[in-house]
Amino acid sequence: MPPVNFGSYQTKIYHDGTNLNRLPAITTNPTLLEKHAREVLSSRAYSYIAGGAGEKSTMEANRLAFRQWKLVPRVMRPMDDQSISVNLFGQEYKSPLIVGPVGVQGLFHRDKETGVAQVCSELDVPYTLSTASSSSIEDVAAANQAGHRWFQLYWVHDEEILLSLLKRAKENGFTVLVVSLDTWTLGWRPTDLDQGYFPFYAGIGNDVGFSDPVFRAKHEKKGGKIEDDIIGAANAWVSELDDRPHTWEQVEFLRKHWQGPIVLKGIQHADDARRALETGCEGLVVSNHGGRQVDGAIGSLDALPDIVDAVGDKMTVMFDSGVRTGADVIKALCLGAKAVLVGRPVIYGLAIGGKEGAKSVIECLLADLWQGMGLAGMRTVADCNRDCMRRISYPGDLKTML
């Protein structure tokens, strides 16, 4: 796969602005994305995407963890054949960046999941569809066309419905199954609680379930048609996902019925990583759900080194939670992640400018990653290692949030 110069996006912005008086559609400044999104979203929608568990201390820890790791640039290194491509599960990708699963994208813009999946295909960036989506599996696959797509599973309790979801995902070209382990029940989220708002109870974000033939048949057998009672159907679907944790032993059921890589998402402790390795799954994501589940927890980046040491190269370790910039991606790679999932920034872009806004955010992240690696003397992802960083705290690092 020939390398892609993602830094050319920076050149394009300067050229368009200088010669054509054409400025970027949305800001390139990651510190302003949330502010601009808040200006266009309803209070309920903004609270849902920007909120976290409790007093948001885990969200803050995610950002503070990044600030406490500093890159140590190297100079005078050849960069003629710079590449940020990676190989994950035998598949070559042009970069280590993956758009992670975020639910109810229709809450933020009418372009929703299908729009983001489309631009991911255009950029050749993997798109991860959430079970909690406002678009169906089939519609997202059609929008993503020949793109790389992964399916994130919220583990439904009814095995017949679960098998139907897996079948639909596989038949529609989703190649990697990402299983969320940390959301079997909701974290305590005051920003949503104060507004008494949970979009799924309003029928928003249930499209994967509502479009499932097995769920529909079971619901109708109980005497109700989904379209005649959206609220009742919403309650039935949510009950399939909530309040009953699964066990490590049950992972075998997924392995039996999914032909492809399985990634366990939500690992924060090295012992859980070792247990994940024992299941035979191919990968894991070091993630605390962006600080939305457990308040008072460690920053996800702080969990990464121990987990990488625990499983070594026996599993593909990936990372999310708190990623805002290209430098953040580099730091996660240096600490051992093979790929990095990003969520909130893409959704802020979607809110501000629809699918083109989401595309701009992804392009900015890729360009920032490319430029940052090159300037730090990292020709390829293989050059990203712990020797490239130092852990140092400065007083200004107490400013944690982007």
Swiss-Prot record:
Q: Which GO terms describe its molecular function?
A: FMN binding; oxidoreductase activity
- Cofactor(s) listed in the protein's UniProt record: FMN
- Phenotype on deletion? Impairs the production of quinolactacin A2 and leads to the accumulatin of N-methylkynurenine.
Q: Where does a 2-oxocarboxylate bind?
A: Y48, Y154, R189, R292
- FMN hydroxy acid dehydrogenase domain mapped to chain residues: 22-394
Q: Where is the active site?
A: H289
Q: Which CDD domains match?
A: LMO_FMN (cd03332)
What EC designation does it have? 1.13.12.-
| Keyword presence, Oxidoreductase | yes
Q: To which protein family does this belong?
A: Belongs to the FMN-dependent alpha-hydroxy acid dehydrogenase family.
What does it do?
FMN-dependent alpha-hydroxy acid dehydrogenase; part of the gene cluster that mediates the biosynthesis of quinolactacin A2 (QUL A2), a fungal alkaloid that features a quinolone-gamma-lactam hybrid, which is a potential pharmacophore for the treatment of cancer and Alzheimer's disease. The quinolone-gamma-lactam hybrid scaffold is synthesized from the combination of L-isoleucine (L-Ile) and the nonproteinogenic amino acid L-kynurenine, followed by quinolone cyclization, oxidative decarboxylation, and lactam formation.
- Name the PANTHER family for this protein: DEPENDENT DEHYDROGENASE, PUTATIVE (AFU_ORTHOLOGUE AFUA_6G02720)-RELATED (PTHR10578:SF86), S -2-HYDROXY-ACID OXIDASE-RELATED (PTHR10578)
This chain belongs to the protein called: FMN-dependent alpha-hydroxy acid dehydrogenase qulF
- This protein's gene is called qulF
